[in-house]
A protein has these predicted regions:
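Regulatory N- and C-terminal appendages and interdomain linkers associated
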Residues: 1, 263-279
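A conserved alpha-helical element in kinase catalytic cores
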Residues: 26-68, 86-102, 197, 206
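Conserved short submotifs of the Hanks-type protein kinase catalytic core
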Residues: 69-82
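Active-site acidic catalytic loop and adjacent metal/ATP-binding pocket
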Residues: 9-19, 27-28, 152-197
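An alpha-helical support segment within catalytic cores of ATP-dependent transferases
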Residues: 108-167, 222
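Active-site activation/catalytic loop segments of kinase-like enzymes and analogous catalytic loops
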Residues: 196-226, 235-253, 267
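Short, flexible/disordered intra-domain loops and linkers
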Residues: 34-41, 249-259
């Protein structure tokens, strides 16, 4: 038997590629409620989502689950691949862009019931109202336009409406490249909405990891049918979310996530400043 821990990501639990005595392989993720009280429910949700995805979806297949004594473990098909290189390589980014397009096509209309992306923006993927009420110190530009940012993010729930099942957490550490194909992994946050929302949420992490600027990434993605004001509303909500959550204490077992959110928040904020032309 052999187990090799896999680096990356923000889960406080085990993530390992495992080879059993009979030579079979799988990828195992497991967590105890003592490590983080919220993560076991995320593993359960991921099992529900992945087990219901159609065979055409480019995902690692769920093989088994274990849920007992405060521990939840999931066994997935072992994908012999790698996460995208950092800094981003142009060929791998193009592969991801094409793969995410295909995934959206396969998952439209949604094959499963799930919460709406708009509900997420209405309840927690936002932050400007929180930052305003807390009187938190802000970037000069954000402070100048704080009321407008509050109003703009309030439009995001309606803007996000759609009938595609979105991964809703697309980042380099949530994908594997193997055999010139991209496999999208880690599905607990899946929601139903408009595909453009996925691209907007993905873009700040690409630039943070030394890929193209968000607007350059959007030029790789045909979003001609989406109004600029709708795009700006979602970017505003994402920026507010990242910046507000970055000020909170880190969740148990995930000490680095707030710095990750802060970096993406600053990128999203600068992106929004450039798009709005507000000075």
């Amino acid at each position: 038997m052999e187990a090799v821990t896999q680096p990356g990501g923000f889960s406080p639990g085990l993530a390992a590629r495992v080879r059993t005595r009979d030579g079979s392989r799988c990828f195992v993720k497991a967590v105890s409620e003592l490590a983080n009280p919220d993560t076991p429910s995320l593993h359960r949700r991921e099992a529900e989502v992945v087990s219901a995805l159609p065979p055409e979806a480019s995902v690692a297949r769920l093989l088994w689950t274990y849920d007992e004594g405060g521990w939840v473990a999931l066994g997935f098909e072992d994908i012999d691949g790698h996460t995208p290189a950092q800094p981003w390589r142009e060929d791998e980014l193009r592969l991801v862009v094409d793969g995410l397009h295909r995934l959206h096509d396969v998952l439209t209309p949604t094959p499963i019931d799930s919460a709406a992306a708009g509900d997420g923006f209405a309840t927690h993927i936002k932050g400007w109202s929180e930052l305003k009420s807390s009187r938190a110190p802000l970037d000069t530009w954000a402070a100048r336009y704080l009321d407008q940012l509050v109003d703009l993010e309030a439009q995001a729930p309606a803007a996000a409406a759609g009938d595609t099942l979105l991964h809703f957490d697309v980042r380099a550490d949530n994908m594997l490249i193997a055999r010139d194909q991209v496999f999208f992994i880690d599905w607990p946050w899946a929601r139903i909405g408009a595909p453009f929302v996925e691209w907007l949420a993905f873009a700040p992490s690409v630039y943070m990891q030394h890929g193209p600027k968000p607007e350059e990434l959007l030029r790789m993605v045909p979003l001609a049918a989406v109004d600029d004001s709708v795009i700006n509303a979602v970017i505003a909500s994402l920026a507010g979310y990242f910046l507000a959550y970055a000020r909170r204490p880190p969740p148990p077992g995930i000490p680095t996530v707030r710095a990750f959110q802060a970096a993406q928040g600053q990128i999203a904020l600068e992106w929004l400043r450039e798009r709005t032309g507000w000075r």
